[in-house]
Amino acid sequence: MRRDVNGVTKSRFEMFSNSDEAVINKKLPKELLLRIFSFLDVVTLCRCAQVSRAWNVLALDGSNWQRIDLFDFQRDIEGRVVENISKRCGGFLRKLSLRGCLGVGDNALRTFAQNCRNIEVLNLNGCTKTTDATCTSLSKFCSKLRHLDLASCTSITNMSLKALSEGCPLLEQLNISWCDQVTKDGIQALVRGCGGLKALFLKGCTQLEDEALKYIGAHCPELVTLNLQTCLQITDEGLITICRGCHKLQSLCASGCSNITDAILNALGQNCPRLRILEVARCSQLTDVGFTTLARNCHELEKMDLEECVQITDSTLIQLSIHCPRLQVLSLSHCELITDDGIRHLGNGACAHDQLEVIELDNCPLITDASLEHLKSCHSLERIELYDCQQITRAGIKRLRTHLPNIKVHAYFAPVTPPPSVGGSRQRFCRCCIIL
């Protein structure tokens, strides 16, 4: 808030007179002022630091800078800024996000690692100047590191994973998505020193083979989350070892791993009863047989992405409706064998009334307005995708809205085709995206 005083615009912080500030400082002990300042964000702290010398000292006290997120300032953050922050915060800093800060490189992060040895959570997602040298620094100075995000740091190699293994034994969560130089050798080195890993994001690590998963399955019994999206070389052999070695697994993304078959679903059903999230989009070899085993054994499923699992039929939906009462999000996009009958079972199932929030049915050509009738009793339903469902009508959507007035319906409808022009030119036809 800014106020005009004698023609001069001043911020609320600048409106404090010396006497006002002196009263506050006199009435409240330093410890209490520090406690108040600890609730302020980075921008507000910097503003407070400009009020007076006393507040400058309080605002810039290292204890107020335990958690810093610089994403909103990513274009302005250069290495020297990180170095200055590290010198000011020192051992107080526990969590730092430099996501998207393209100007930050190895030298600045070495200074940071030397000064902030109690760091526990570090996000370097998209810091493309980062190389193995940064992980070497973290290994040398930051032994308390628990969460590290190196996604899209494409210069990272197996050497980084070896360094982390040697110096960061408490590591629980690591994201090296799109670090496509990483191979099974790096994974082997990592898991031997970081056996407490709970979350591992390997999306787009296209060189990884089944051997890498065997190392994970053998050394990471605490693993809860694993993302293998578009790891194209992965097969049943590798994923089965994960299922057998990681019984606490709750979230698995294998979207784009087109080599996997029902053997994976059987292994998950037999070994991972706590599974909550399964993403297997574009895994076209999966069938009703595998999903039947999965549904009958994994009753805690909450989110399933089955996009382009083109072999599944209503049988899968029947099993989910019976055995998965917690299901909240279900994607069936491009599952062209799904019919109104499957949606009827889902709408009458255990998850329907209080749990189901999102269902994606785009490009399911057999779905009609009858499916919308079956879903009207799903009172928690927030969004439904109906793009390119040619048998869905505006009238059907309108009827659904009478029962679920707050639902977001996404659908395509072709506009009315205009009459031929007098000049006889070729008729044009367009499809418009209408967000209903």
UniProtKB/Swiss-Prot annotation:
LRR repeats lie at residues 74-100, 101-126, 127-152, 153-178, 179-204, 205-230, 231-256, 257-282, 283-308, 309-334, 335-363, 364-388, 389-414. Substrate-recognition component of the SCF (SKP1-CUL1-F-box protein)-type E3 ubiquitin ligase complex. Role in neural transmission. Interacts with SKP1 and CUL1. It comes from Homo sapiens. InterPro entries: F-box_dom (IPR001810), Leu-rich_rpt (IPR001611), Leu-rich_rpt_Cys-con_subtyp (IPR006553), LRR_dom_sf (IPR032675). It comes from the Eukaryota. It is found in: Cytoplasm. GO terms for biological process: behavioral fear response; regulation of protein catabolic process at presynapse, modulating synaptic transmission; regulation of synaptic vesicle exocytosis; SCF-dependent proteasomal ubiquitin-dependent protein catabolic process. Gene3D superfamilies: Ribonuclease Inhibitor. The gene is FBXL20. The modification Phosphothreonine is found at T417. The lineage of its organism: Eukaryota, Metazoa, Chordata, Craniata, Vertebrata. This is F-box/LRR-repeat protein 20. GO terms for cellular component: cytosol; glutamatergic synapse; presynapse; SCF ubiquitin ligase complex; Schaffer collateral - CA1 synapse. Its main location: cytoplasm. The modification Phosphoserine is found at S421. The keyword Transcription regulation does not apply. SMART domains: FBOX (SM00256), LRR_CC (SM00367). Residues 22-68 form the F-box domain. Keywords: Cytoplasm, Leucine-rich repeat, Phosphoprotein, Repeat, Ubl conjugation pathway.
